[in-house]
Amino acid sequence: MYAVIKTGGKQYRVATGEKLKVEQIPADIGQEITLDQVLSVGEGDQLKVGTPLVSGAVVKATVLAHGRHDKIKIFKMRRRKHYQKHQGHRQNYTEIRIEAITA
């Protein structure tokens, strides 16, 4: 069984037992969370698509860790004007493990 969930403004296709890095969620490590924004649920060749959400569908997950992604470098430059700007950014994430999908 798999599901398409929405969290942090992004959509993820998840299955039971899968590990996933999502946008930061304010929860403690080891805490079980419920993700109720389920866009579709599928099993085998059957697919249930919500309009926009599947009613009654819930994905349960456990928080494994919090961390930060690798640094990306931002470089802005204006030609012939001796203007250069360097900047870096590291995005926070939460690593979760999908425990159960109920539809």
Curated annotation (Swiss-Prot):
Pfam families: Ribosomal_L21p (PF00829). GO terms for biological process: translation. One of its GO terms (cellular component) is ribosome. The keyword Lyase does not apply. Keywords: Ribonucleoprotein, Ribosomal protein, RNA-binding, rRNA-binding. One of its GO terms (molecular function) is structural constituent of ribosome. Transmembrane segments: none annotated. The keyword Ribonucleoprotein applies. This protein binds to 23S rRNA in the presence of protein L20. NCBIfam families: L21. Part of the 50S ribosomal subunit. Contacts protein L20. Belongs to the bacterial ribosomal protein bL21 family. This is Large ribosomal subunit protein bL21. It comes from Bordetella pertussis (strain Tohama I / ATCC BAA-589 / NCTC 13251). The gene is rplU.
